């Protein structure tokens, strides 16, 4: 039998014929390791001198001939499971029909071995059959960390360890993972941790890696000393540092826990210096930290030496530019830093970025702004100099999108304000990034610039798909709503097309009589809504929405049932402004009023809602009895001397409106330039609409000016929210928010029908917190809830970032709002009383009645959290308003907390799924 074995590292006597090998009686060497291969190669060294080479040539007369056995007839792989034969063929680069070549096979074996999956690889050749033999490494079937953390924390550690399920087992990789785990634990503040590694065989060639962690203790900085500091307080000095002195009750949110973060300690000196430079101390010098640790108590003292120097003010600001593509006056006007200001390094950086933006918006993407300082130490003055190198005009070469596993490229491209061949613009680049974030499709968005040459640039758009679909079910119980079930299916990015769809249903069984005067089963509700929205029809700036809805609910004072449909067409004006026009047809029926007197607001003047009620004086009754006559009923209005106790009450309209039909057109305008969907830090949001039900006319309502309905009015409404991140001013993660809204209902004459459920009510998360949703309302002389013909609310909020990793914030708020209504008598504008004298027929009619207002205010705290279920707000409000008296002689001046005004106040609210 003719046989040749080829090692991965050496081929012995390749020029010796197969016959010579057999005649020599030598046996093929099975070289299975680099060490053995090296030893064998030394034994089979080629002859070193000419005589030896001649003798070798005599012994191998057929060395220049290729025997048939050396031609490859087939290739096979023995013991290979990590990859397919096809992939192995691509790696070895040997094909059937090739002539056996030692170097080629050696290269092939090494290429296979270098894949990292095998302990050893060798090749054999017999009868034209080339076989590669593999001894594969074990696979990692799983990685477990025992003795530390939650599953989320463990996943975070595993990502840092560089070892995961499916990897090949490797001792060096294992040791690296062990070291990385210890380092990660130290980074979290745990020192002296012990990590032991063990392996468990799961199956043949599969191992479970278990890291047993004996977590060390945290070291706390009990005291931080800044020797030489006199002009800044310790808390200010430490404001940017990762390592700070532990506060009293430091475990509470918002306080310094004092944990030692050793991996950040070397950078804290620079952070402290930056704090000083933000306050004008340009000569400040901070020593390297000295840490003294007591491992018996796990307490530490942190010591720095500080040289503060003098505080500098800005004497002058100069701008030097090599190519004045933007006028110097324009650049100077854009700067925030002013002469005579205390120098602030943060403002210097911000102004450098402003100058960069001004130049880059003209297309000069590679412009460089180099700030320089000219100090006058004697007088404590500094001259700020900005040197600008403009560079070449830059155009976009290509836009490369990655990370969108579900969302199609065109959905992303249509939000970008820059495309191939466009002139570069930095502001448009940032707006494009913000526009992608506002979609709410992605959890991460980043646009990077890649330079092609001095005049071309690629834009690399990297996104990470977020949760755009929601399937929610809720179950709860409340004193008002009873057993509550709700469910919704919504998708903001349907099949990756950018379209949105939602199906919503809400059911509440009702909790009975929660408050005096409410109908039995108050709180019972069923509501359903189906909507489909395409925000960009055919990738144009036009959008469309179709929705169907129906509802049945027992409200505070009546039962409402109805339904309808709506269609809407809109258009984007730029990338921030949206305008739409929609049509809506709604049929609503109100019944089951808590008081029959509510019928007067749906009935005609010909219908008696409540008959006249009378009483007979006692003297008349006694006289009739003494005369032997039949006594009259005390409540009879026909008896002689009867006194009217309650007049006859009729409806107020010219016809019956118990089932009104509303046919309306709505014009809507919205604007949004915020930088995030859920947690905006900067920017404004504005939206407004005008709904015209019927056509304006001073005459009687008919089918034409009612647009097919019998409701006629124009309702205008707008809301505005502004956000500003105060971190650059206060050095803490604090967001200031201001939100306001206002609306009014205009009617053309006092006979135009106005539904009670279309007026404005206050109370709840979206208006004035601390009052039950929709429970603040003007009342008529009978105490009936009418709502207002106008509304205005304003809210101020300060939101502090408590846990950045958990996306949790704590906010303080102050809410104020009022509702307007008409009364028959003149009086002061603000009119707070348990019972007002609102005249509903005059609502919204210019010149009819007198405009009054009832106002409320509240303050409190709220916790804001992007939870796994979505945005969640927990609200703890305190309601108050100004009341001059409580009806019992007790006077109140100024702001009165929780007065007795028959308001339904509450001290806890929550909201899910809304923007903050």
Swiss-Prot record:
Residue ranges, compositional bias (Polar residues): 29-41
UniProt superkingdom: Bacteria
Record-given protein name: Outer membrane protein assembly factor BamA
Domain POTRA: from-to ranges: 70-137, 138-214, 219-309, 312-391, 394-466
Pfam families: Omp85, POTRA
PANTHER family per record: OUTER MEMBRANE PROTEIN ASSEMBLY FACTOR BAMA, SORTING AND ASSEMBLY MACHINERY SAMM50 PROTEIN FAMILY MEMBER
Keyword Transmembrane helix carried by entry: no
Location in the cell: Cell outer membrane
